[in-house]
């Protein structure tokens, strides 16, 4: 990073305390008043290309790779997950479950705004608003978490999946700042409306706010007992920092959510392995809903995204750098000790199963932003660069996480102000 930095310490005891933990103090800058400012990309507008830093890969090579990935998932008829409909809309298709999810729709929108693909962005948003949005009833303002490719909500009043709304809101803010608000959509007002709507529920009809108002944490699902639990991978402190800055409503509440999310991620990360559970209580304890179809206390499907969330927050804001370096070091060293072999574990590392996946390779490479161990970071970055583009029936989830990870690691996943 071509920045003059100094360590954020005022006394040597603090520095020695960090060093005794094996964690380096985080570099900071000083602003014009001499006050320390974290050296995250939000403050510096400097986005690192780790492929270049660690592997010597040129910007031209990186750009070609990103274009290849775009064509793979959005253009190529044999491998894409982006499909356009006759009504000037488009959707991201979950090829494994054969449905359309707010998760994928919002990921697709984020990818499009990062790559300046406004036409595709608008078509995805048009589909989500037309088919997924509840315009009346107890879920009004929320988005049904999955639909058929023909736009029919699956099941009787399907609930929302909180990460969909989170990525919708943030991608709409970015769209507002990139393209303005005078086209097909006033993107800023679209984002503001969701932010207001999802915090306007009092529970009287069985539906609550997207965030638990006491814990300041995003809920697993804002209904029933699920309102009092979370999914660690839904906790995106870097996004919540931006909401606190840009929201027109509940600003004081949003200011409290980034640190709450950071604490949750730190609490949920196992103290030896660094592994996260798929679902947890608000204190980070692994949690499984009664009669659930699989053991959500394990590191399995959702949990792989936690490394991406932590890495993004580290390089965007750097406000919890010591904790984040420590938890990512535990996590990636655990995977290295497992020879990057398995995909699923109990959070203590027992009962390994499955094969180390494309999504894990991507998310862990984003986590490498927070590593002090440069050799391990290089190994993770190399794995991401070398990973073949996913194909076949289950290319959707791993593929979307992989594509966003490639944008992060190449310096192309940016805060669009």
Predicted regions and their residues:
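Extended ligand-binding clefts on enzyme/binding-domain cores
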Residues: 29-68, 75, 98-102, 137-144, ...
